[in-house]
């Protein structure tokens, strides 16, 4: 839990929920904090013990502790962009999220869209800008129209995102997004119902969870809406059975084509009655306010079962 990004506190919440809900008759869990400057375990009485980064071990009261599996709840870097996955793969330590390549790919919105287009996945119109490039508002408007969304290309939880309604807002929005990443993506506005689809590997099967409809009190599903109660999250979504099956099948298709494992949560907007893919989150939030645990509950899966299945799947991989 933890990480190096703006999502640090969200990750801590997720990690604590997992820690609390693991079956103690099967697992002996430790709370591992991975921060920019230090890696440590929180022991009894909240005592920190430093992690040996050369082999991911810790010594507590003279006893060397090694780990059979890592439950990865880090959002953003390094847990969601492939860095932690690559490190653990080198050490031959199983972990619960997707592998290095899938993690790096899905964290990069530009690359992910490029990979998915050959499979017929509909997306918003998009325009990409690298830091240092000239930003041409007229060219952007000609490509994606107004209103549009300016986003950091590699960031989660809607950090660094602005809904732009006029030409004069484009430059400030790009500067804001560049605070999160050196690449930005500008997307056309899609008017329609926003939904979130969790897809997981559960008991050795790929399972699409009940669909959640997202109704934000803000103009879009930003950080406040996601984590500070500024949205309604309605599970199951108020869409037809046909729409539900269609968006679940697309989410499962993406999961299979990318050779995913672990948890994923894909966001779509039904525009002109067609689901348009927005993004995939491969380390979705697992706090009490998060969508995927709500979906699991709606499917009759307890948190203990959900988290236990993730560990068992990782150990068998």
Question: Predicted segments — roles?
Answer:
Residues 188, 197-199, 255-288, 296:
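Conserved metal-phosphate-binding beta-hairpin within the catalytic cores
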Residues 213-264, 291-317:
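Active-site "cap" helix and flanking loop/linker of ATP-utilizing ligase/carboxylase catalytic domains
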Residues 29, 94-95, 123, 148, ...:
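Hydrophobic beta-strand scaffold residues
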Residues 1, 13, 64, 105-192, ...:
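Active-site nucleotide/adenylate-binding loops and adjacent lid/helix of ATP-dependent enzymes
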Residues 44-50, 86, 221-228, 282:
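Short, flexible, mixed-charge acidic loops at enzyme active sites
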Residues 165-249, 270-276:
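Phosphate-binding site of ATP-dependent enzymes
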């Amino acid at each position: 839990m933890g990480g190096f990004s703006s999502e640090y506190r969200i990750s801590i919440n997720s990690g604590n929920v997992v820690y609390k809900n693991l079956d103690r008759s099967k697992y002996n869990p430790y709370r591992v904090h991975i921060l920019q400057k230090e890696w440590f375990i929180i022991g009894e009485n909240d005592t920190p013990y430093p992690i040996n980064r050369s082999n991911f071990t810790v010594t507590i009261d003279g006893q060397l502790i090694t780990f059979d599996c890592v439950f990865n709840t880090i959002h953003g870097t390094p847990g969601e962009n492939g860095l932690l996955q690559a490190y653990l793969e080198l050490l031959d330590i199983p972990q619960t999220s997707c592998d290095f390549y899938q993690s790096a790919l899905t964290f990069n919105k530009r690359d992910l869209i490029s990979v998915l287009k050959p499979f017929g996945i509909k997306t918003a119109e998009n325009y990409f800008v690298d830091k240092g490039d000239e930003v041409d508002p007229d060219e952007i408007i000609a490509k994606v129209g107004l209103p549009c969304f300016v986003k950091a290309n590699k960031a989660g939880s809607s950090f660094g995102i602005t809904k732009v309604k006029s030409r004069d807002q484009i430059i400030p929005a790009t500067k804001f997004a560049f605070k999160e990443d050196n690449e930005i993506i500008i997307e056309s506005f899609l008017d329609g119902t926003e939904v979130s689809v969790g897809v997981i590997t559960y008991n050795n099967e790929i399972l699409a969870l009940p669909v959640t409809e997202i109704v934000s009190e803000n103009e879009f599903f930003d950080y406040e809406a996601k984590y500070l109660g500024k949205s309604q999250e309605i599970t199951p979504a108020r869409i037809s059975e046909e729409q539900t099956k269609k968006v679940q099948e697309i989410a499962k298709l993406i999961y299979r084509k990318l050779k995913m494992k672990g948890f994923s949560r894909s966001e779509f907007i039904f525009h002109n009655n067609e689901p348009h893919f927005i993004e995939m989150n491969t380390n979705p939030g697992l706090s009490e306010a998060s969508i995927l645990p709500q979906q699991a509950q709606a499917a009759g899966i307890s948190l203990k079962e959900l988290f236990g299945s993730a560990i068992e799947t990782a150990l068998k991989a």
